[in-house]
Amino acid sequence: MSEIAQDSNVSIFSKNEKKARELILKLGLKPIQGVSRVTFKKKDGQIFAIDRPEVYKSQGGNFVVFGEAKVDDFTQRLAKAQESLQQNEGVLPAGQDAVSKDPQSIQADMQAAADSATDKPSADDAVDDAEVDETGLNADDIELVMQQAGVPRAKAAKALKEHDSDIVNAIMALSG
């Protein structure tokens, strides 16, 4: 009998669970990878949490979740987080202030930052004003890049020229 490595992830299923998994696959449910935690909140505020769940998605967009559901005591987790914060209160990275803000002021700060970013014209915006030579480019390709990347015609034409009329690379360059 071979040994199983200590850090390997091995699951042993019962006969009934194995049958249930086969039925899930027959129903066309697709497994979703990368889900580390699922929480369900009831109307009365009670929270159920499933750590390391197995999540499947149906063709209709519904999700099926398998795992051990536990009642999540949010107040206890919050108390632990506050306790650890108080222990580390004196230790802040350089240049940061311990300021508590309400949600409205945080949103106002975010809006101000977004407004200041849009007020500054960038070098790319100068391209919008200038005419770009569209010779050798297909008008349908330019329209497609404009639509997919959400950019003006001049930017789309410039990106297509830079990428030798490669639509995919032009869209990726403008989107990224």
Curated annotation (Swiss-Prot):
Residue ranges of the region described as Disordered: 85-127
Domain NAC-A/B: 14-78
Keyword Acyltransferase: no
Compartments, record wording: Cytoplasm; Nucleus
Keyword Transport: yes
Matching SMART domains: NAC
GO (cellular component) term, any one: nucleus
Lineage: superkingdom: Eukaryota
Keyword annotations: Cytoplasm, Nucleus, Protein transport, Transport
A Pfam family hit: UBA_HYPK
The UBA domain, residue ranges: 137-176
One Gene Ontology term from the biological process aspect of the record: protein transport
Protein family membership: Belongs to the NAC-alpha family.
Assembly description: Part of the nascent polypeptide-associated complex (NAC), consisting of EGD2 and EGD1. NAC associates with ribosomes via EGD1.
Function: Component of the nascent polypeptide-associated complex (NAC), a dynamic component of the ribosomal exit tunnel, protecting the emerging polypeptides from interaction with other cytoplasmic proteins to ensure appropriate nascent protein targeting. The NAC complex also promotes mitochondrial protein import by enhancing productive ribosome interactions with the outer mitochondrial membrane and blocks the inappropriate interaction of ribosomes translating non-secretory nascent polypeptides with translocation sites in the membrane of the endoplasmic reticulum.
Name this protein carries in UniProt: Nascent polypeptide-associated complex subunit alpha
Biological source species: Kluyveromyces lactis (strain ATCC 8585 / CBS 2359 / DSM 70799 / NBRC 1267 / NRRL Y-1140 / WM37) (Yeast)
